Every structure is written in C-alpha cells, then in structure tokens.
C-alpha cells in the first residue's frame, strides 16, 4: 500500500515538472514571436523618420514659405506616431538650429510665427523611455523555469515517511496483557467460613410448627443459646456445638411452644473450623437437613436458596478443605 502511494506521488511530481517546463518554453516562444512581429513596424517607422529628415533638409535650403508649411505638418505626424505606436529607438537631432539664424534675413517679421511651433519636434527626446520595455520580457521567463522544478520532488516523499511512523508502535504493546493472569494464582487462603443450608416449604406453602418441632428433636437438636436449636457432639446436649438451626424469618429465633407456629423454612449453618473433623460434621449436617425436609414435606436448598446439587456439595467440601489447610 505504501509503495503504491510513493509511486503515485513520484508520478504526480514528474507530471508537475513537465508541465512547468512546457509552460516556460511556451511563454518564451510567445514573447520571441511578438518581438519579431514588432521589428517590421519599427523598420517602417525608421524609414518614415529618415524620409521626413530628408524632406526637412530640403526645406531648410528652399523658400521660407515652404518651410512654414512643413513645420505645421510635422507636429501632427509626430502626435499620430506617439498615440499609435512607440517611437523608434533612433534619436535624431533636427537641424533647426542652423536654420533659425537665416529666418530674420530671408523672411519678414511675419515669418517669426514658426519658431513658436518649432520646439514641438523636441518631443522625441522623451521617446527613449519606451526603449527598455521590449527588452524586459526576455528576462522574465528565466525565473519560473528553474525555481519551481525541484520543489515537488523533495516535498513528495516527506508525507510518505511520516505516514509510516505512527504505525510501528501500535503492534508493540499487544503481547503485554498475556502475562497479567499471574497474580490470580496468589489468592489468600480462607482461614474461616460458614457453610449454610436451608430447608424450605414448597412454593406457596409453609412448614407446620408441630411437625417441625418433632423433626428437629428427632435430628438431635436441642433448644439453647440465642433462642435457636443446636446440634452438639452428644445427642443428650453435652459437648461443643457442631452446627445450629435458626428460623428463616428475621430475627431467626424460635418459641419452644410451636403448636400454632408456621414458617416458610429454617436455616442450618456450620462454622468452619469447628470441633472434630469438619468433613464428618458436614455429612451429619446434610443428613439432618434431609431428615427434617422429609418429615415436614420440604426441600433442601443451598446458601442462595436454590435446589441443592452435587456440584454445590463438592464446592462446600472444597471450602472446608481450604480452611483446614490454611489453619494446619
């Protein structure tokens, strides 16, 4: 892609250079042709001036009346030449100075009128102002032929080089995020946890208090601290508590007189680490929950109050092992 862009820029620069050269040659040839066209006019004009000069010389040697007639005719011709075309480059000094001293001798005082018009032929002295004009166009086409030619050649590759620069650092940081999952392996181990199960009635129903009380007592729970039931190491209530049972409804307490009591469910929980073997205590806790659910017609749920599954039971066992390893 970048090679194609570079080739296009080179072709465009070459076309621009060729166009500038053709334009320079065309302008120079046009100005030369205009100069050649003006030369025949200048030659004809110079011939006319020479003829007028010869006539002036002949008039100076002739009669005064003829000279007066020629003087009046000469300024009109000079004004026409100045308005139509630039005057010739030849500068002639009219020989009127030699003719002026003869005027008071040959002519009467009335012939002194022509000297008032005689200074008009001196106007061709201002004509040299037009002489440098045809020479100036010859120097103008020289500058555009040389100066603009190297500019597109050097400026074309610069944007192409700048376009490559931002593309290189983009690919460098891509492989870096691959090494980030390493800190995940260093999770701190749990030193304590709480395993929770629920025994709940079916949707739209509640557990009967009298049936619930009989099933709790058959599972080995005894009413005790915090007004909840506890399962101790011994069925008679002696020894440390292994796990406990509370009401699912806040504040979670029970009334020993449960004949008229109803509840949507109960919660069984065990704190790890606990007395004895935590995995054996977990199995006893699961058996107690299944016994109560069978007696009251409920179901066993996990800590999220979802149906208990074998995967969730293995997750509980993994948590217990992790806590045991952390406290070993």
Swiss-Prot record:
Its main location: membrane. Residues 51-63 have a biased composition (Acidic residues). The chain crosses the membrane at residues 7-27. Residues 28-328 are cytoplasmic. InterPro entries: Cell_div_ZipA, ZipA_FtsZ-bd_C, ZipA_FtsZ-bd_C_sf. It is found in: Cell inner membrane. It is a single-pass type I membrane protein. Residues 42-186 are annotated as: Disordered. SUPFAM superfamilies: Cell-division protein ZipA, C-terminal domain. One of its GO terms (biological process) is division septum assembly. Keywords: Cell cycle, Cell division, Cell inner membrane, Cell membrane, Membrane, Transmembrane, Transmembrane helix. One of its GO terms (cellular component) is plasma membrane. Residues 1-6 are periplasmic. Residues 123-171 have a biased composition (Low complexity). Coiled coil: none annotated. Belongs to the ZipA family. Interacts with FtsZ via their C-terminal domains. Essential cell division protein that stabilizes the FtsZ protofilaments by cross-linking them and that serves as a cytoplasmic membrane anchor for the Z ring. Also required for the recruitment to the septal ring of downstream cell division proteins. NCBIfam families: septum_zipA (TIGR02205). This is Cell division protein ZipA. It comes from Shigella sonnei (strain Ss046). The lineage of its organism: Bacteria, Pseudomonadati, Pseudomonadota, Gammaproteobacteria, Enterobacterales.
């Amino acid at each position: 892609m970048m090679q194609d862009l570079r080739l296009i820029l080179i072709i465009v620069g070459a076309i621009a250079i060729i166009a500038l050269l053709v334009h320079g040659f065309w302008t120079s040839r046009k100005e030369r042709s205009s100069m050649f066209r003006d030369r025949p006019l200048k030659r004809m004009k110079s011939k006319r001036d020479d003829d007028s000069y010869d006539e002036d010389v002949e008039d100076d040697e002739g009669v005064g009346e003829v000279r007066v007639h020629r003087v009046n005719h000469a300024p009109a011709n000079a004004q026409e030449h100045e308005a139509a075309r630039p005057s010739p480059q030849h500068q002639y000094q009219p020989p009127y100075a030699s003719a002026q001293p003869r005027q008071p001798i040959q002519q009467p005082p009335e012939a002194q009128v022509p000297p008032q018009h005689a200074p008009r032929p001196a106007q061709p002295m201002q004509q040299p102002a037009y002489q440098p004009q045809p020479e100036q166009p010859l120097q103008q086409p020289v500058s555009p032929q040389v100066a603009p030619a190297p500019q597109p050649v050097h400026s074309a590759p610069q944007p192409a080089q700048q376009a490559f620069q931002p593309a290189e650092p983009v690919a460098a940081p891509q492989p870096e995020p691959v090494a980030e999952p390493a800190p995940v392996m260093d999770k701190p181990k749990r030193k304590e946890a709480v395993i929770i199960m629920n025994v709940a009635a079916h949707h739209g129903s509640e557990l009967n208090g009298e049936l619930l009380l009989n099933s709790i007592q058959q599972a080995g729970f005894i009413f005790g601290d915090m007004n909840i039931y506890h399962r101790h190491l011994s069925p008679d209530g002696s020894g440390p508590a292994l796990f406990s049972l509370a009401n699912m409804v806040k504040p979670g307490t029970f009334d020993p007189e449960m004949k008229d009591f109803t509840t949507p469910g109960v919660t069984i929980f065990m704190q790890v680490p606990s007395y004895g073997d935590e995995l054996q205590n977990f199995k006893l806790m699961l058996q107690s929950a299944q016994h109560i659910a069978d007696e009251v017609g409920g179901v066993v749920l996990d800590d999220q109050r979802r149906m208990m599954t074998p995967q969730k039971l293995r997750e509980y066992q993994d948590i217990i092992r992790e806590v045991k390893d952390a406290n070993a």
